[in-house]
């Protein structure tokens, strides 16, 4: 019997089309959700940030400070002084330029107030009225021509006056208390601003020097 030659053929590879490979089944993965704990942390963080911003804004807009009042300049006129050791005297007219600065976010409305001039520690030698008015937010109002008539006739004790007259200087102090209210975002607050300015009246030169306001 003649042996038959057997040839084993490798299996033929079948290649599919490229479009068939790409159109294979797609695997859909379910989107993972954030744990409930993280959402709670995010919410609390946002609340804390909003609360902090509210505190910062309230501290800026709702903070109410005292308006600043000061004497910018003072001039003199009709100055007279003299007498003797038993009857010394002085008389003068002071004309002041006063400013009131309101640094708040609300208007400042103040009532009529009194400006007093004090001679050293001996007492009041003159006073006048400052009419009330309105100072808008972040504005400065200048009150010009505030006239005060001063004189030693108001003093009960003229001790040391003769010595000061001979030296040619009088130590004076102007004091004013301004009371008013400030309205910010519906809130009304009463504030009292106090002015205290020291100065020296030069009798020889007939002018004010060393003006300093606290």
From Swiss-Prot:
Cystine bridges: none
- Which biological process, per GO, is one annotated for this protein? defense response to other organism
Annotated compartments: Membrane
Name a single GO cellular component. membrane
Keywords, ordered alphabetically: Membrane, Transmembrane, Transmembrane helix
Instruction: Quote the InterPro entries the UniProt record gives.
Output: NDR1-like (IPR044839)
- The UniProt entry lists the main location of this chain as membrane
Span-the-membrane segments of this chain are 41-61
Name the membrane topology term: Single-pass membrane protein
Family indicated by similarity: Belongs to the LEA type 2 family.
Please identify the protein, giving its name as recorded.
Late embryogenesis abundant protein At1g64065
Q: Which organism is it from?
A: Arabidopsis thaliana (Mouse-ear cress)
């Amino acid at each position: 019997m003649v042996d038959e030659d057997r040839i084993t053929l490798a299996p033929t590879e079948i290649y599919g089309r490229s479009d068939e490979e790409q159109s294979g089944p797609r695997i859909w993965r379910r989107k993972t959700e954030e744990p409930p704990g993280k959402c709670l942390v995010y919410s609390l963080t946002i609340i804390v940030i909003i609360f902090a911003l509210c505190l910062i804004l309230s501290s800026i807009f709702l903070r109410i400070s005292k308006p600043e009042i000061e004497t910018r300049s003072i001039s003199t006129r009709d100055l007279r002084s003299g007498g003797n050791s038993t009857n010394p005297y002085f008389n003068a007219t002071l004309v002041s330029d006063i400013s009131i600065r309101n640094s708040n976010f609300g208007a400042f409305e103040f009532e009529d107030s009194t400006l007093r001039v004090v001679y050293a520690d001996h007492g009041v030698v003159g006073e006048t009225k400052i009419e009330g008015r309105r100072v808008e937010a972040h504005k400065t109002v200048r009150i010009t021509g505030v006239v005060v008539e001063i004189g030693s006739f108001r003093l009960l004790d003229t001790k040391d006056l003769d010595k000061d007259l001979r030296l040619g200087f009088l130590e004076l102090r102007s004091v004013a208390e301004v009371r008013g209210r400030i309205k910010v975002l519906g809130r009304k607050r009463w504030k009292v601003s106090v002015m205290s300015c020291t100065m020296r009246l030069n009798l020889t030169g007939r002018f004010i020097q060393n003006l300093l306001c606290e």
